[in-house]
Amino acid sequence: QNGKSTIANVSKEGSMERVTMKFITEAAGLKIQQISFDKGAPRYGALLGGQVDALFEQPGDVRKFLDAGKFKPILTIFNERPSVFADVPTHREMGMSFEPLLRFRGFYVHANAPANRVEWLQWAFQRAYCQDSYQKFNESKFMTVIDSYRDTAGARKLINNSIAQYRDVYKAMGL
């Protein structure tokens, strides 16, 4: 069904999801029509209602559909299979060699923040991250499929690597 298959995706050109779909379609030699939705609910409804063939989404956002058996994962965008999706192939297993882009968020301080305040905040955030209640929340959203905590050096490395990836892709896409 080359060119006739449809996938619900976010509408923002240049988004992580759109860039990843570019990687997938180029690596697999596919044409897939991406149907844009700004909000999650219409994307999920499109798959539930049969208006699209597939959905690009992070698993935590559709957990209730996965748990209810209404959605089924068919591909993970990780270098290795996460244990919670042990029966779902990775993009690499399907012959795609691109490095996955990761969604990330962080905490930032003013550039002139005192060093002792920065150190205390780093300690507090790491301590909060390690709390059982937060780990349970992370597990409920499938946010433990990768190591999701980064210290300052790790965050800088992730951000800088992501910038380089996006820069190359945006240039190739003409953005």
Placement of each model-derived feature along the sequence:
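Hinge/capping helix and adjacent helix->loop/strand transition within the periplasmic-binding protein
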Residues: Q1-P42, H91-E93, F104-E139
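Ligand-binding pocket segment of bilobal, Venus flytrap-like solute-binding proteins
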Residues: T6-V88
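Extracytoplasmic/periplasmic, Sec-exported soluble proteins
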Residues: K12-M16, K39, A54, Q58, ...
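An extracytoplasmic/periplasmic, membrane-proximal ligand-sensing/linker region
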Residues: L30, N116-L175
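Residue-level detector of short coil/turn "hinge" positions at structural boundaries
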Residues: I32, K72-P73, F98-P100, V145
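Short secondary-structure capping/turn micro-motifs that flank functional sites
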Residues: A41, R63-K64, P82, F107, ...
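A short hydrophobic alpha-helix cap/turn motif
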Residues: L66-D67, R92, C130, K171
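Periplasmic-binding protein-like
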Residues: L75-A111
